[in-house]
Swiss-Prot record:
Belongs to the EF-Ts family. This is Elongation factor Ts. InterPro entries: EF-Ts_dimer_sf, Transl_elong_EFTs/EF1B, Transl_elong_EFTs/EF1B_dimer, Transl_elong_Ts_CS, UBA-like_sf. The gene is tsf. The keyword Protein biosynthesis applies. Its main location: cytoplasm. Gene3D superfamilies: 1.10.286.20, DNA helicase RuvA subunit, C-terminal domain (1.10.8.10), Elongation factor Ts, dimerisation domain (3.30.479.20). PROSITE patterns: EF_TS_1, EF_TS_2. Residues 82-85 are annotated as: Involved in Mg(2+) ion dislocation from EF-Tu. One of its GO terms (molecular function) is translation elongation factor activity. It comes from Prochlorococcus marinus (strain MIT 9303). NCBIfam families: tsf (TIGR00116). Keywords: Cytoplasm, Elongation factor, Protein biosynthesis.
Length: 218
């Protein structure tokens, strides 16, 4: 892989509308060749996806996924720009895949990092700052370590940051961007809810032997 300059990355971004990191990777994979890098982005469905992301996505669909055994269920809203696209196989396939992803990730609570409340971030920071292994370290070093740990922890809570269950080489965010590029519309994961059978219900734990004994004496 070739080293690429910041100017090349910027030029490719201006040309394709793809993200900076995607452009850098495309150029590295293409030995700095702009034409090949553009083709690489198109094949990945990334080219122009960033430009589409600024357009309003008010159509779409609400999908469901019920896991085998019917113990976990998911409702998920996926948005696009037109009803025609919402009915298409690519969009419906993405809807199913992302809903399945939510079912497989019990720790996920938010769609994106921007949705994480400030108080949640501060709480995580407070917990990490109090770790025994950080005691005695300089404040600047401690802050840097905590920032890294928090970043990793917060990613675990975010749907778009998860490795895609069908292809761990990409994240859910990259999957959505790829499909958006193929469809030619802005596609956004709006919200989701994950249900687990019996979650939140308190069940009385009765000793079976005692219960049988009480039945005999009744």
């Amino acid at each position: 892989m070739a080293d690429v300059s910041a100017k090349l990355v910027k030029d490719l971004r201006d040309k394709t509308g793809a993200g900076m990191m995607d452009c850098k990777k495309a150029l590295a994979e293409s030995d700095g060749d702009m034409i090949k890098a553009s083709e690489w982005l198109r094949k990945k469905g990334i080219a122009s996806a960033e430009k589409k992301s600024s357009r309003i996505a008010a159509e779409g669909a609400i999908g469901t996924y019920i896991h085998t055994g019917a113990r976990v269920g998911v409702l998920l809203e996926l948005n696009c720009e037109t009803d025609f696209v919402a009915r298409g196989d690519l969009f419906q396939g993405l809807l199913k895949d992302v809903a399945m992803q939510v079912a497989a990730c019990p720790n996920v609570e938010y769609v994106s990092t921007e949705e994480i409340p400030v108080d949640v971030v501060e709480k995580e920071k407070s917990i990490e700052m109090g770790r025994d292994d950080l005691s005695g370290k300089p404040e600047q070093m401690k802050a840097k370590i905590v920032e890294g740990r928090i970043g990793k922890r917060l990613k675990e809570l975010v749907l778009l940051e998860q490795p895609f269950i069908r292809d761990s080489s990409m994240t859910v965010a990259e999957l959505v961007k790829q499909v958006a590029g193929k469809i030619g519309e802005n596609v956004q994961v709006r919200r989701f809810t994950r249900y687990t059978l019996g979650e939140g219900i308190e069940v009385d734990q009765t000793d079976f032997a005692t219960e049988v004994a009480s039945m005999k004496t009744a």
